[in-house]
Amino acid sequence: MTPDVNVLVSAFRPDHPHHQPARKWLDEAVRQAANGQASLSLMGVTVTGFMRITSNPKIFKQTDPLADVCGFIDSLLSCPGVQFQQLSSSWPTMRQLCLTQQIKGDLISDAWIAATVMQSGETLCTFDRDFTRLLPSDQLILLKP
């Protein structure tokens, strides 16, 4: 399993309207990873998106200190069974996905995440319904806000 940017942001920020379901999912995913019931991977593209959003004053009036943002990721990575996903050769999958689905603009980042998920065999957890068009249902957990 791997969390999308929106799940990381929501789980991290107690003031986020989706904090409770995101935190519940993330805590359970960490527990399952620690018990060997599931894997939990953090992708570089989602971690950088998380850092970009939580430190952006155009998104949050009260941005989070970068040390806290990095500390959140570090705390996840320190849990047994949680790993930082190594780069994969997702380009051919992303290219094909963008061409067949005519993906452009804001969905390009989502296409990269989807391609990485497909390539790695992971399951993505997100609030973002756009992924229903990018990923097969067995590789997608769509949380309800």
Locate each region found by the language model.
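Acidic, PIN/NYN-like endoribonuclease modules and their adjacent C-terminal/linker elements
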Residues: A114-P145
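Active-site-proximal, substrate-binding regions of enzyme catalytic domains
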Residues: T54-G81, S88, P92, L97-L99
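Active-site neighborhoods of divalent-metal-dependent phosphate/nucleic-acid chemistry enzymes
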Residues: C79-C125
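Acidic active-site catalytic centers that drive phospho-/nucleotidyl reactions
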Residues: D4, D110, D128
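Generic structural signal for secondary-structure transition and capping sites
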Residues: P17, R31-A34, I59, S78-V82, ...
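Aromatic- and histidine-enriched alpha-helix N-cap/loop-to-helix transition segments
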Residues: L42-T48, I108, W112
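Short, well-structured N-terminal submotif of metal-dependent ribonuclease cores
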Residues: M1-L42, P57-G71
